[in-house]
Amino acid sequence: MQRGIQGYTIPQGTGNERYGTFVPHPLPPDPAIVWSNQLRNKFDQAILALGRLDSMAMLLPDTTLFLYTYVRKEAVLSSMIEGTQSSLTDLLLFELDEVPGVPLDDVREVSNYVAAMERGIMRIRDGFPISLRLIREIHAMLLKQGRGADQTPGEFRRSQNWIGGTRPGNAIYVPPPANLVLDCMGDLEKFINDIPEQTPVLLKAALVHVQFETIHPFLDGNGRLGRLLITLILLQQGFLHQPLLYLSLYFKTHRNRYYELLTLVRTEGRWEEWLDFFAEAVIITATQAVEAAQQLLELLEQDRLRINQLQRIRLSCLHVHRALSERPISNARWLVERTGLTSMTVNKALVQLQALGIVQPHTAQKRNRTYAYTDYIAVLNRGTELPPPA
């Protein structure tokens, strides 16, 4: 359904530098969403896919084995959409104080995203509502260091921003003027918290993401925070108990269509097309997450069986193997801290695991060498490959 423009334009500028800022109408869309049989079926499938993902998470023998890397995979993917050149391996190396293979600012951005996501999840689990205060708190974590640290972290913008182009006058899109950001975000806060009426959770997450991107309330970090809001809404409303859904994988793969639909919603009110795209993203991503978890569980079990065939230091190898399943790129120092084993025992276990082909050295130095659980990382890395150099 084409509703026409979903807001109004305020003329700005003087002389030859004239442009219009776009102010969106508050949610929900008006006229209301038209639920065709196809769209309703797509949303039903998405809800079922989320249910399967959540059930799988509840049945995992140890969710912590997956959470550490799944959260970081989403951080890498979401940051890639914004042009950051950091792989999952780069992030894991950075967290070990090792030198990654890309500029440090790129990895810091991804590391900030992890910290922001973990802060948001902690607040949600502590019973905090998704409020403007929480959104600003998460944003402060997102831009706490590296690029963007000078873009007023944790504060709504007080100046005009724009998307595309070199200035508002030649931009692709110019969000609301700074003096209306708080009003727009206040309306969005009410909608998130079901004021004045309740909205189905998955529909809410889909609508809120577009509205947040349209308002663009911060000078930097809007895309990453807008995608993070999807996860937080699903967690807060009980649709997911663990943050194992990484929609950024689908958005990255279909990046052009993603941005096209954000524009079509604003300019023509084509919400149904966005909702179809969003539901498809949930179905595919949730299904892939379940499959990846199953593959990782099978890999862990197969490798444990191989380790159990060892005649010497079998138990020590099992302890180190379990620690590597938490952090599949680790060094001896971290493994000693995590397992409580001596440095000598950890190094002997790593030699045995390398002989079995389970781990490979990732760095050449002899002291505190970094090791990679290669097959485990290969499963996680699907979809996070860096684009080829231009």
Report residues per predicted region:
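FIC/Doc superfamily catalytic core
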Residues: 1-390
